[in-house]
Amino acid sequence: MTEDLLSGLSIPDDADSEEAAAIAAAVGAHLHDQTAAAVAAAADEEETWDEKRWQYAGRLDSVTGCARRVPSGAPTNAWAASGRTDRF
């Protein structure tokens, strides 16, 4: 995507060195902001129990007959969490 943006970039022929530097700085800042936003979005995609804790607690209740609250620090991998049901 960055290459697409740069290939379409043109600096006017009558731009002096200060104007060209300002254009380059603005484009550089924009690309930096896009990269930072992509990194932040990737960090937000971390798997959590936020949506699944109650579903998993219900499954534990139906299988073991004992309702337990799943701690937020429990492994998000269901197989790993199932091995720790005695600790919940």
Swiss-Prot record:
Keywords recorded for this protein, A-Z: Ligase
- Gene Ontology MF: a single term: propionyl-CoA carboxylase activity
The keyword Hydrolase is assigned to this record: no
Q: In which pathway does it act?
A: Metabolic intermediate metabolism; propanoyl-CoA degradation; succinyl-CoA from propanoyl-CoA: step 1/3
Q: Identify the EC number(s).
A: 6.4.1.3
Taxonomic lineage is: Archaea, Methanobacteriati, Methanobacteriota, Stenosarchaea group, Halobacteria
Task: Provide the function of this protein.
Answer: Part of the propionyl coenzyme A carboxylase (PCC) complex involved in propionate utilization and in the production of the poly(3-hydroxybutyrate-co-3-hydroxyvalerate)(PHBV), which is a water-insoluble biopolymer used as intracellular energy reserve material when cells grow under conditions of nutrient limitation. The complex catalyzes the carboxylation of propionyl-CoA to methylmalonyl-CoA. PCC is also able to catalyze the carboxylation of acetyl-CoA. PccX could be responsible for the interaction of the biotin carboxylase and carboxyltransferase subunits.
Protein name per the record: Propionyl-CoA carboxylase, protein PccX subunit
Q: Does the keyword Ligase apply?
A: yes
Q: How does it assemble?
A: The propionyl coenzyme A carboxylase (PCC) complex is composed of three subunits: PccA (biotin carboxylase and biotin-carboxyl carrier), PccB (carboxyltransferase) and PccX.
- Domain of life (superkingdom): Archaea
What happens when the protein's gene is inactivated? Answer: Cells lacking pccB and pccX genes accumulate a high level of propionyl-CoA, which would then inhibit CoA-dependent enzymes such as succinyl-CoA synthetase and could partially inhibit the TCA cycle. Also affected in growth and glucose utilization. Cells are unable to produce PHBV and show morphological abnormalitiess such as a decrease of PHBV granules.
Q: Which reaction does it catalyse?
A: propanoyl-CoA + hydrogencarbonate + ATP = (S)-methylmalonyl-CoA + ADP + phosphate + H(+)
Q: What class of enzyme is it?
A: ligase
